[in-house]
């Protein structure tokens, strides 16, 4: 099953959580984030406080990775691209929900992280879920490797 970029975006929009990976001085840092989408734009927004380490990391290196994963759906998506910060009220408002009252004391302290993907890689095993357990048992019995499902790289 080959997916178009449009189909990939449809899949991504179904997720309510992901991992945002940025570069710290000497290592990669990952943290769970809630993705937000503005209309049909092919960017992902995240909301954070201006008082987090993510701000300095993004200012020093704009490269980032966003990873979506669903064992239940048999779908894994990795996006590589660039991040930038936006304190534009429209970007913050697009993300703000009541749940952020618990994380960010003052809405004025909120800033949006705008992620623009440049490439994507996904693994789709959704059509194999029913036979995945059998494939695993068979490969153990035969000392072989199971079929991991489909993998595709996309330039965005």
Annotate each PLM feature.
Residues 1-19, 25, 140, 149-153:
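Extreme N-terminal tail/first-helix region
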Residues 5, 46-47, 137:
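Conserved short hydrophobic patches within well-ordered secondary structure
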Residues 10, 36, 103-105:
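Short secondary-structure boundary/capping segments
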Residues 12-16, 61-62, 116-117, 147-148:
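A short, compositionally biased
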Residues 16-50, 56-58, 64-70, 76-79:
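Short beta-strand segments
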Residues 53-102, 107-119:
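Short, structured beta-strand-loop surface elements
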Residues 108-156:
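C-terminal edge-of-domain segments
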